[in-house]
Swiss-Prot record:
InterPro entries: YspA (IPR010697). NCBIfam families: PRK13660.1 (NF010181). This is UPF0398 protein LCA_0919. Belongs to the UPF0398 family.
Length: 186
């Protein structure tokens, strides 16, 4: 798999507010493990959006991984041209910083937001420009990623498209693994 679509929960859906905390540490640990596996299998492009949460954290982790995998490229594909403009100043600043760090950043639709059809067009773009997905989503905890999960399932009916879903059970296992590793360090 050369091109991976990364998406999932927004930060508020996971109860993560700010740039630190145990939940965020576990999520970034998970992202690093997942992306390392993809990189070892030949991943060239991580393609994601700019949403606060899994997408932005994935970009941050990918930037760190570039030290060991300088061939990794990161693309931030935004659904529409005025994406993030309704956010507060701090969140807009984070988005601007990440936009400057990635290898490629463009809106899929070069017009301001006008309706939900743009989000469906964005999903279709992401599906047709990637070889598979890494989706942080748990069917037991509905949220925004549910729309992406449904779009992926519909696309899979006609196309070979691997979808690796990370659910809360897997995150809990990784939290336990990380705690064990941290305890061994002392």
């Amino acid at each position: 798999m050369k091109r991976l679509w990364l998406t999932g929960y927004r930060s508020y859906e996971l109860g993560v507010f700010g740039d630190s905390g145990e939940k965020l540490k576990v999520i970034k640990y998970s992202l690093k493990k997942q992306l390392n596996n993809y990189l070892d299998d030949g991943l060239e492009w991580l393609i994601t959006g700019g949403q606060m949460g899994i997408e932005q954290w994935g970009i941050q982790v990918a930037q760190e991984l570039k030290i060991d995998y300088p061939e990794l490229k990161v693309a931030m594909m935004l659904p529409f041209s005025d994406f993030g403009q309704q956010w507060n100043e701090q969140n807009q600043g984070t988005l601007m910083t990440l936009k400057a760090q990635v290898d490629f950043c463009e809106p899929v639709i070069k017009a301001p937001y006008s309706g939900p059809q743009q989000l469906r067009q964005y999903q279709q773009f992401m599906l047709t420009h990637t070889d598979g997905a890494l989706l942080y989503y748990d069917r037991e905890a509905p949220g925004k990623p549910e729309y992406d999960a449904k779009a992926i399932e519909t696309y899979q009916e006609q196309h070979e498209y691997p979808n690796n879903q990370v659910d809360f059970f897997e995150l809990q296992d990784l939290a336990n693994e990380l705690a064990e590793l941290e305890n061994q360090a002392f």
